[in-house]
Amino acid sequence: MKFEKIHNKGQAQIFRNKYLEYLTKTHPLVIWSLYLPVIIFLLYYSIARLHFSAGKALLLFGSGIFFWTFFEYIIHRFVFHFVAESPRARKISYVMHGNHHEFPRDSQRLFMPAVPSIILSSLIFLVMKIVSGTFAFAFFPGFLLGYLTYASAHYAIHAWHPPFKWMKPIWRNHHLHHYKDDEKGFGVSSHFWDIIFGTAFNLKAEKEDKEAVQKLMFKKKEVQNILR
């Protein structure tokens, strides 16, 4: 997904049909409101109805969060950055992730839209249920929270400066992925798997361009409009 120009303003038109185009956009609070009740209910169900101990539920929940970080890396590297050859495959690749690389500051497409998100998460839960049985009721909520954390971190990286100094490497890693080399830095919420698989940036060797980074952030007025 190499583009002649990366646009820091505007957004891609993915579909000509205005209704389909509308479904490609979402607000972070919509996704949180969809999945937070599911997380709470499944944890309640695993303890109250399946009689998991609090320790067992917490272990499965934590394992789900950790598994998300691996899933995030694999999907980003091998699915979102799949090298498409045919025109149809390139179109699919662009719809899934290419539009984000061409318009990285499009605030309406920093979370997966609700409809495909619900379909995909339902399929993932079904697979987990088949593989792990009732354990999925405590494991899947952790996986979902991992996704929400990742998506929120992704949103924050494109919207604001890191709120804490220790978060700065996470921000720099993703900026370098977008603006220097999209074959590295596939982890967004964590560098762990990039380090394991040798795709991490050497942040100490990368010169930071503060002026260029400033151009990536949303302006105060933009943020206020988004949060309304």
What are these regions (language model features)?
Residues 51-53, 147, 163-167:
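N-terminal start-of-chain detector that recognizes signal peptides
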Residues 180:
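Active-site rim elements
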Residues 62, 66, 144, 165-168:
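Residue-level detector of transmembrane insertion/anchoring sites
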Residues 1-140, 152, 183-228:
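Non-catalytic, topology-defining segments of multipass membrane proteins
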Residues 170-176:
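Short, membrane-exposed interhelical loops at transmembrane-helix boundaries
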